[in-house]
């Protein structure tokens, strides 16, 4: 083994140089680490995952499966065959909104709203505690209501109004006639509801307050033209989708094709709730099921 006296002067110089290099490397490493820590501290606020504001569905178990609710501003398609509970989901969503102070636009093409009120009461939800305004009413409300109802009669009224406001066609000398179940009639009715609720600034189409929009069901608007479902869905979303509007859109499920009646709504929706039941003739009982097929910006339950 070599002793210190065996090391030559040249070797000592080399060792000193190596030590200096190591010290320099340590200094550089420390400087880089300090810079990294400073940068991390400086940019940490910008690297955080943005907080998603969530809207309660009105069903605690479903909220839990959705990390607290659906993202605010989402459009949720609710699909399923008759009798699976689609309308009941809508009632819970509306009720949660009323309790939270959110105004509600409730479009119902499947039943009269008075029947919705009766059914909701069976589940402990009394909509008549709140001010309800039917858009088919000829009288303007004295104060903004909590719920604006748009049923087939309201749609007929809006269709008549926009038909009368249309200019004459120069070739046919006739006006375009809008039907109650025309998608443009629905869009006009929704915007009229926003005005009645008092949530629009003058000249704006975007509500300044969060609104819950329920359409039960959209299938009625393309019942005679299911191939147009995607086009109509896009038209509705372009015209009515706003950051301050969270929507439930019901679509009937065709038993023959095992898919939604009209292709396209699920594609434009941010989330899809699907409901179904076992074949009652085979099972001899009613067994209903529910699954979250998709929900953007949400790590939702998968079963």
Model-identified regions with their sequence ranges:
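Conserved P-loop NTPase
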Residues: 20, 30-33, 37, 53, ...
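Conserved nucleotide-binding/hydrolysis micro-motifs of P-loop NTPases
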Residues: 110-114, 122, 153-158, 219-220, ...
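Loop/turn-to-beta-strand initiation segments
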Residues: 103, 146, 208-212, 242-250
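N-terminal pre-Walker A segment at the start of P-loop NTPase domains
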Residues: 41-61
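Phosphate-binding/switch loop-helix module in NTP-utilizing enzymes
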Residues: 150-241
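Phosphate-binding/switch region of NTP-binding enzymes
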Residues: 246, 250-303
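Interdomain "pre-motor" coupling segment immediately N-terminal to P-loop NTPase/helicase cores
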Residues: 2-40
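Walker A/P-loop NTP-binding active-site region of P-loop NTPases
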Residues: 65-147
């Amino acid at each position: 083994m070599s002793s210190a006296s065996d090391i030559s002067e040249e070797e000592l110089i080399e060792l000193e140089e190596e030590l200096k290099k190591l010290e320099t490397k340590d200094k550089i490493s420390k400087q880089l680490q300090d810079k990294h820590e400073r940068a991390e501290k400086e940019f940490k606020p910008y690297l955080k995952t943005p907080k998603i504001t969530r809207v309660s569905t009105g069903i605690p178990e479903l909220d839990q499966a959705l990390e607290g609710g659906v993202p605010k501003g989402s459009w949720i398609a609710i699909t399923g065959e008759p009798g699976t509970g689609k309308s009941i989901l809508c009632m819970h969503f509306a009720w949660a909104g009323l309790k939270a102070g959110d105004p509600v636009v409730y479009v119902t093409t499947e039943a009269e709203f008075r029947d919705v009120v009766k059914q909701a009461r069976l589940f402990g939800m009394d909509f008549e505690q709140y001010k309800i305004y039917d858009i088919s009413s000829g009288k303007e409300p004295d104060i903004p209501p909590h719920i604006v109802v748009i049923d087939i009669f309201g749609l007929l009224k809006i269709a008549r109004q926009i038909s009368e406001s249309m200019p004459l066609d120069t070739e046919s000398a006739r006006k375009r006639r809008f039907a109650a179940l025309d998608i443009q009639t629905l869009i006009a009715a929704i915007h009229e509801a926003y005005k009645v609720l008092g949530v629009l600034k003058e000249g704006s189409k975007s509500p300044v307050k969060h609104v819950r929009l329920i359409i039960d069901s959209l299938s009625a608007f393309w019942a005679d033209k299911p191939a147009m479902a995607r086009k109509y869905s896009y038209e509705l979303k372009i015209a009515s989708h706003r950051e301050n509007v969270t929507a439930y859109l019901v679509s009937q499920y065709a038993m023959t094709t095992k898919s939604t009646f009209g292709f396209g709504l699920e594609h434009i929706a941010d989330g899809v709730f699907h409901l179904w039941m076992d074949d009652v003739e085979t099972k001899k009982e009613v067994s209903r099921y529910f699954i979250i097929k998709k929900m953007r910006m949400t790590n939702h339950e998968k079963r």
